[in-house]
Amino acid sequence: MTFADRLSAYTRLIRLDKPIGILLLLWPTLWGLWLAADGMPDPMILVIFILGTILMRSAGCAINDFADRRIDPHVSRTRNRPLAAGLITAREALLIAAGLSLCAFLLILPLNLLTIQLSVPALFLAASYPFTKRFFAMPQAYLGIAFSFGIPMAFAAQTGTVPPLAWLLVLANLFWVIAYDTEYALVDRADDLKIGIRTSAITLGRFDVAGILLCHIIFLSTLTYAGILLQRGIWFYGALLVALGLVIVQYGMIRKREPSRCFQAFLHNNWIGAVIFAGILLDTLFRTDQSF
């Protein structure tokens, strides 16, 4: 294998060619940073969190492929992944994951002690999630916790504390992750049933679409409550209304459970995250005394 081929395999291992995972992890982190800083996050902290998100998501992908190295060859969507296809070794995947995790840890060392302490459970959750599909009926809930840890870390880095509001945002994001990752799981449900993998799409059975919609509703309702506590204005609530419209569009995509359409719905969640961030950003830029 040439150097270019190996570099391409490494890039595909950590999914740099598929940035959707980075974006879905980044949006709630940015929500947390902007709300913690009331619209004026420290530039150094912002850069650290953006780079850290990229590094940890990439490390998580490498760990995921290591954990699923004997499963991926039997799933049509994943059989061509570098590790499953034999282009790289399990040892290489572990070394890459460890290297990226170390870089992410070194990156946060300039931040306060609380942020560094929170990075420990964040790393554990990211590293252990891929193995939960063997014994958890709802591994998407575990992923939701892992994908939400950027929020308390953002508050800790920006303010030195983790207030109840941060955990309310974690709760909201948890249900969002369950919703979009269940859409993702619908793509592979037929293969997962054959090989015995557990996912929320399998656990929910015929209530899968209803469960996704319920999780989206809880997600948006919790954000609405957070907005009330923070006395947010029209831009924030307008963004939530747009996000609700996007959820309705997603329902049209997933209601027939066609794998290709379910995957499109999963990708569509990037726009929900972006719209909510835009609402938070505009709300802090054009703050008025009026709020709902």
UniProtKB/Swiss-Prot annotation:
List the InterPro entries.
HB_polyprenyltransferase-like, Prenyltransferase, UbiA_prenyltransferase, UbiA_prenylTrfase_CS, UbiA_sf
**What residues form the membrane-spanning segments?**
20-40, 43-63, 94-114, 135-155, 160-180, 209-229, 234-254, 266-286
Pathway participation: Cofactor biosynthesis; ubiquinone biosynthesis
One annotated Gene Ontology cellular component of this protein: plasma membrane
Is Cell membrane found in the keyword set?
yes
Q: What is one GO biological process annotated to this record?
A: ubiquinone biosynthetic process
Tell me its EC number(s), please. Answer: 2.5.1.39
Q: Which reaction does it catalyse?
A: all-trans-octaprenyl diphosphate + 4-hydroxybenzoate = 4-hydroxy-3-(all-trans-octaprenyl)benzoate + diphosphate
* Molecular function per GO: 4-hydroxybenzoate polyprenyltransferase activity
Name the cofactor(s) required for activity, per the record.
Answer: Mg(2+)
Q: Where in the cell is it found?
A: Cell inner membrane
Q: Name one Pfam family in it.
A: UbiA
Q: Which UniProt keywords apply?
A: Cell inner membrane, Cell membrane, Magnesium, Membrane, Transferase, Transmembrane, Transmembrane helix, Ubiquinone biosynthesis
Topology versus the membrane, per the UniProt entry? Multi-pass membrane protein
Q: Which family does it belong to?
A: Belongs to the UbiA prenyltransferase family.
Q: What does this protein do?
A: Catalyzes the prenylation of para-hydroxybenzoate (PHB) with an all-trans polyprenyl group. Mediates the second step in the final reaction sequence of ubiquinone-8 (UQ-8) biosynthesis, which is the condensation of the polyisoprenoid side chain with PHB, generating the first membrane-bound Q intermediate 3-octaprenyl-4-hydroxybenzoate.
What is the designated name of this protein? 4-hydroxybenzoate octaprenyltransferase
